[in-house]
Curated annotation (Swiss-Prot):
Top-level taxonomy: Viruses, Riboviria, Pararnavirae, Artverviricota, Revtraviricetes
Domain of life, per lineage: Viruses
Name under which the protein is recorded: Virion infectivity factor
Domain remark in the UniProt entry: The BC-like-box motif mediates the interaction with elongin BC complex.
Nucleus found in the keyword field: no
Protein family per UniProt: Belongs to the primate lentivirus group Vif protein family.
Major localization listed first in the record, in broad terms: host cell
Modified residues (Phosphothreonine): 98
BP GO annotations: viral life cycle
Amino acid sequence: MEEGKSWIAVPTWRVPGRMEKWHSLVKYLKYKTGDLEQVCYVPHHKVGWAWWTCSRVIFPLRGDSRLEIQAYWNLTPEKGWLSSYAVRMTWYTEKFWTDVTPDCADTLIHSTYFSCFTAGEVRRAIRGEKLLSCCKYPRAHRSQVPSLQFLALVVVQQNDRPQRDRTTRKQWRRDYRRGLRLARQDSRSYKQRGSESPAPGAYFPGVAKVLEILA
């Protein structure tokens, strides 16, 4: 009597393009800007007991939790070279783990990385003063119900930007495939605004947008 096969199914998100853009952005924000300095990046490697290969990006979060994004190549039931890509997103602690969606991954990353509006910005906006902080990860708020204060600060932030910055933001929306250049351009533009500009740091376009899933 033949022994039946046992399968372990996990949810993955199919990526239509290649993974170089995701890896380039993570490495740029880790080694160049320092926004993801605490992130552990495991480059593309072969899994010894399988025919597929993968890479790992591990985000340490608050407490003892972690968010891990694994990128798979050739993740198919058949052996052989098939140009297919997929990602798996897992949140885990020492005793528990679960798979999460890209929107949830954005929220988890923003809870630890990339600055957001501070409490004093509402008072500055009411007094008509220039904002000293801004949200570097606006996509992380898409899955949440935004407060009136947050919506008002977003409008003030958009109106306070120079025209060249608005043009750059429109370009980012039209072509989200330029994730690495997005971070570089935003970092340079804020360095040119003087001492009254918001805190330095790069924008993060969001996991789904960089990987072109659900975007």
